[in-house]
Swiss-Prot record:
Residues 28-52, 300-334, 472-495, 863-894, 910-999 are annotated as: Disordered. Residues 609-804, 1109-1174 form a coiled coil. This is M-phase phosphoprotein 9. Residues 401-800 are annotated as: Required for its centrosomal localization. The lineage of its organism: Eukaryota, Metazoa, Chordata, Craniata, Vertebrata.
Amino acid sequence: MEEFDLVKTLHKTSSSVGSDENSLHSLGLNLNTDRSSPHLSTNGVSSFSGKTRPSVIQGTVEVLTSLMQELQNSGKTDSELWKNCETRWLQLFNLVEKQCQEQIVAQQEQFHNQIQHIQEEIKNLVKLQTSSASLASCEGNSSNKQVSSESQMGFFSLSSERNESVIHYPESTEPEIQQEMSTSQPDCNVDSCSVSSGYGTFCISELNLYKSKDPKEFMEHIDVPKGQYVAPAVPAESLVDGVKNENFYIQTPEECHVSLKEDVSISPGEFEHNFLGENKVSEVYSGKTNSNAITSWAQKLKQNQPKRAHVEDGGSRSKQGNEQSKKTPIEKSDFAAATHPRAFYLSKPDETPNAWMSDSGTGLTYWKLEEKDMHHSLPETLEKTFISLSSTDVSPNQSNTSNEMKLPSLKDIYYKKQRENKQLPERNLTSASNPNHPPEVLTLDPTLHMKPKQQISGIQPHGLPNALDDRISFSPDSVLEPSMSSPSDIDSFSQASNVTSQLPGFPKYPSHTKASPVDSWKNQTFQNESRTSSTFPSVYTITSNDISVNTVDEENTVMVASASVSQSQLPGTANSVPECISLTSLEDPVILSKIRQNLKEKHARHIADLRAYYESEINSLKQKLEAKEISGVEDWKITNQILVDRCGQLDSALHEATSRVRTLENKNNLLEIEVNDLRERFSAASSASKILQERIEEMRTSSKEKDNTIIRLKSRLQDLEEAFENAYKLSDDKEAQLKQENKMFQDLLGEYESLGKEHRRVKDALNTTENKLLDAYTQISDLKRMISKLEAQVKQVEHENMLSLRHNSRIHVRPSRANTLATSDVSRRKWLIPGAEYSIFTGQPLDTQDSNVDNQLEETCSLGHRSPLEKDSSPGSSSTSLLIKKQRETSDTPIMRALKELDEGKIFKNWGTQTEKEDTSNINPRQTETSVNASRSPEKCAQQRQKRLNSASQRSSSLPPSNRKSSTPTKREIMLTPVTVAYSPKRSPKENLSPGFSHLLSKNESSPIRFDILLDDLDTVPVSTLQRTNPRKQLQFLPLDDSEEKTYSEKATDNHVNHSSCPEPVPNGVKKVSVRTAWEKNKSVSYEQCKPVSVTPQGNDFEYTAKIRTLAETERFFDELTKEKDQIEAALSRMPSPGGRITLQTRLNQEALEDRLERINRELGSVRMTLKKFHVLRTSANL
């Protein structure tokens, strides 16, 4: 859309418009109807003037409110989000509206500026029409002008092949342009109007020629010859007014030179101009129309910036010259011309008659010269030159043209013509191609080193060199050299265009040409024309572009031979003269004479070559001018009519363009409003669509997440259902198991109660039995006491009888003393041996039956109580061992057996309820006693083991509480405690014996009888222990710690004996126990008869009773261990083989059973050895 581009290029356009409205140098009318930039309004009123700009976005709040309501009605939106969006949208809309308003304001300003320009251009067109009529009348009256009407009007169509230059001055800074417009307006009489209407570009070139008030002004100058042609003066007032309303295409000298290269040669009479005496008027040609718009001037300026570099110093002096010209435009015009080489001044028509002079670029005055004026000899002396220079110092009107355009070299023109004839490419003879490198020009002009004021003052301190330089500088080779010479050269047609200040090498010093005709050069007819000191640098002198008028092609050819010759030709005069000649050397007459001689020779050669050429050229030009004079007025009229028609066309085109612009503006306004509305709607719709898309994406993601969550929850629900079913089944199983366990527990409680009742009943029975047993013990002790007394009395009586019989026999029968003693000894032995067939009391032999029984019992006892060590015992000790065994066996009375059985039943009942762990931890280390003391007193070992078993059974918390023993011993314990009776000397059986019985007793009989000494231990017992007589020292009770410390060593001994001497199985042992009980019953029949009558301490009965009770416990323990061993072996046999697959629990159970079996085997070995030691089990010796 067009307005978008307008917004982007706003700053550029505004800047260009600002430069356009301030620049009055162009009459170009830019009616640009391009749709992209509608800037013009012809009515002078902007389409927006008087109106307030509506809001850029109409209905912004309404649209936003409706959008917000729609989004909020859709729901599922956050209020904070909408507030933030609303705030940001409002800010965005305000920003866009502000920018659009600023753009519109800038457009309005631009429109106003364009309108002003158009109005001014229209006024200028009207003035052009009025001035064209006066020009036509002026041209009709002037008979000296031979100018073609077409070229005088300067109007050329676009199709014209004439490449005439429009000398443009690029835009400088606006203040500088305004100063130049006010003080140094160009003397260009050709007004170029470039109108760009959008449909085509038209250029109107008009030459402003005014007829002077007095026709005599043309020849009023004192030095102007009759043949000199002067240009009509231009009224300063009209030109100044025109400048105010018209824009001139003004070019810098650089651009002038460039454009002249491209232009076609113009007929000489086509460019006559008016030059006033004191004011320089630069001829500006109307050339090829510029088809570019107004904005192309900036581009032109950029292209020509490097070419203006060498005239900056002149530009700095231009302001000073302009100010001086403002104050004194008449009196100080020379100063302004000297200080500002680029200044252009408009001359008033009434000032001096020399205003009419040929342009420095047309070369028109050359062809008006007579043939005699083509060459002048050099002055004979320097003094004459100085005098001629001083005499030519006339009014400043003659010197104001010193800075005007200078003429090209005739040599250059000749060479150019030759090149064209040979169809060679044009040779660039100027130094403009290298403007930064100044031409090396040899000159003798001392005024080059003078300041402008010294040059202007007319006082020439170095008159002679100046005069000499006036002669030198106009030779064909040196005509382009920067000299201050007078134009009255021998080649007066060169117009003495002094270029001293315009050369790039010498920009500070404008040429100051004095109208001083040299005496020797009489024909100085065109000295006024030569004072057209161009404000352009010397390289930009407007040449007589191909002066030859032989053909039309020659007219149209371009001749840009600038005043500054190319660098290769500039030092042409220095062939015989040094390039650098100091000012002091110029005073030397020898050097000066040499210089003059060289220059004369050079001039002679040059003039001789050019004379024929110029004569032919002059003739052809004269013929051409005569042909053009006839049709000049008619051409002017035709051209004027064409111009009027063209102005009408332009006016109609202007109105059409204005209406077109207005319609386009209206259309653009409507489109802009529509675009803004559409932009709002589009932005709103796009934002809404984006928001909806975001919401759709969010809903999609949320739906995906919800689906995933649903799937995950379903899977979890299934897992929970399965877990719930499993838990339900487990709960049912647990309830059933709990019911079953509750039932079992109820049964167990009932059984426990029944067992508790039975236990109480058994306990009561046991208490009654214990009481009865105590009573029996008391009776037995009384009876034993009585028996012991009776035996003591009997023995005493026997002893007394023996003593009396011995005394009697010694007195009466002495010879048979030996036989009597032998018989008494034998009878005594038989009488004392228990089990003998003699009675203890009477000494008579007993019955046969009783004796057989006693013998059988004796043999059985001797066989049953013999240990493997008895085989090694000496035969001498057999009698005493037999006696001890008989006494041990006969001491077990029926009452003692009954008491033993009761104690065994009670002990085994408590022991049987112990756990296996307590059995292994308590029984195992307490089965045997220490090595020495256990072998001596097995009764004590049994009593201690019984106590430990009772204490261990009481520690079991899972069993019903047993009878705990109090710290004070009960009556039964007191009765069961072995009592050692300390007999008095009179009551002691041994000590009570009379001295006569002492020799009957053996050594063993004198010691107390011990039933706890085994026969197999007699060899190992020390002698001191056998010889002890105190029975209290023999009953030693070791503490529990000592017995436990020595258990392991004794156990090892017992196991060794068990494995070596008892390989028979356990059931045999059980049978032996039953056999033994039967044997003991049979044995009890003759117990009284087998009881020894010898002295037996009372304590031995109690020790024996404890020993028998401990053996019964051991036998019962042996039976239970054997039964448990059988059960474990049966369980192990039912387990799978180790090669098969078994579970971990099965393996653990198997290992536990094997460990238990090993422990039972060890216990069985220990118990078996203990029983064998006391001859309860059969040994290998008894088989």
